[in-house]
UniProtKB/Swiss-Prot annotation:
Residues 94-117, 167-190, 244-268 form the Follistatin-like domain. This is Follistatin. GO terms for molecular function: activin binding. It comes from the Eukaryota. Keywords: Disulfide bond, Glycoprotein, Nucleus, Repeat, Secreted, Signal. The keyword Protease does not apply.
Length: 344
């Protein structure tokens, strides 16, 4: 009986496949992380069983990789108790081929590590003077505003050229936007939709702080822009001839505050907690009393049930540069926070 002979080629092929499997397994044994912390450890696990090449192909500057093939329990301990994974290898050691995105550039820091920093392109900016931002703050120029937007305020835009003002007198709003003065006498540029559709439901009616019923929020916005000052919302529904706050039903957790100056009620939020901060600016209220902040004034109004409004920033003993204009407009001061305009 003749026994079959094993072919040496088959054994070599088997060994070759086994080596290939072990090589692939070794290449995929690492873990990919989204950043390397200051303590040198990898944090925020992105994906397991990735090679360094696969992990670093994402192009992110902060992406890092660890070689150890560990179980889920070890990964959990690293992330929760140890401040991250040890033996962290950053994907990028230099700024070569690093894409930080628009408005940013890669630069080596003091520790000789690549970092994305804000570096907006300001070469095409023609206006070199100060600008007023959407946050109501004055920036020394548009480039400084762009840097602030890059760092922490992605929605920040230029409202108008020049310093932020207290009146609309010298404000030139861009495009079709209109200047409106808010409750604290700060000028804002607001874009309004002048074409308002007819209301489809009686629930759309709104009563303005001027005692006028508006068909919808759009109609109230339009009237605000035409007036040039904030009208504000008194309460939802048609205006009624109320004798007191007992006749007015407020919704959304609001409380009725009575305005003795015009003999009307207004629904206001009264659940705001005032922060214990010395950085708040005092305000002079319509009762000629000085409050530590606008929030403190609102708190006093909610406690008494009587509407209080800001006459001007600062103490009532201080002289406002716009006193004359405020006195001229006193009879038509239907001011309201700018946030109420932008919400609609």
């Amino acid at each position: 009986m003749v026994r079959p002979r094993h072919q040496p080629g088959g054994l070599c092929l088997l060994l070759l496949l086994l080596c290939q499997f072990m090589e692939d397994r070794s290449a995929q044994a690492g873990n990919c992380w989204l950043r390397q912390a200051k303590n040198g450890r990898c944090q925020v696990l992105y994906k397991t069983e990735l090679s360094k090449e696969e992990c670093c192909s994402t192009g992110r500057l902060s992406t890092s990789w660890t070689e150890e093939d560990v179980n889920d329990n070890t990964l959990f301990k690293w992330m929760i108790f140890n401040g991250g994974a040890p033996n962290c290898i950053p994907c990028k050691e230099t700024c070569d081929n690093v894409d930080c995105g628009p408005g940013k550039k890669c630069r080596m820091n003091k520790k000789n590590k690549p970092r994305c920093v804000c570096a907006p392109d300001c070469s095409n900016i023609t206006w070199k003077g100060p600008v007023c931002g959407l946050d109501g703050k004055t920036y020394r120029n548009e480039c400084a505003l762009l840097k602030a937007r890059c760092k922490e305020q992605p929605e920040l835009e230029v409202q108008y050229q020049g310093k932020c003002k207290k009146t609309c007198r010298d404000v030139n709003c861009p495009g079709s936007s209109t200047c409106v003065v808010d409750q604290t006498n700060n000028a804002y540029c607001v874009t309004c939709n002048r074409i308002c559709p007819e209301p489809t439901s009686s629930e759309q009616y709104l009563c303005g702080n001027d005692g006028v019923t508006y068909s919808s929020a759009c109609h109230l916005r339009k009237a605000t822009c035409l007036l040039g000052r904030s009208i504000g919302l008194a309460y939802e529904g048609k205006c009624i001839k109320a004798k007191s706050c007992e006749d007015i039903q407020c919704t959304g957790g609001k409380k009725c505050l009575w305005d003795f100056k015009v003999g009307r009620g207004r629904c206001s939020l009264c659940d705001e907690l005032c922060p214990d901060s010395k950085s708040e600016e005092p305000v002079c209220a319509s009762d000629n009393a000085t409050y530590a902040s606008e929030c403190a004034m609102k708190e006093a109004a909610c406690s008494s049930g009587v509407l209080l409004e800001v006459k001007h920033s600062g103490s009532c003993n201080s002289i406002s540069e716009d006193t004359e204009e405020e006195e001229e407009d006193e009879d038509q001061d239907y001011s309201f926070p700018i946030s109420s305009i932008l919400e609609w």
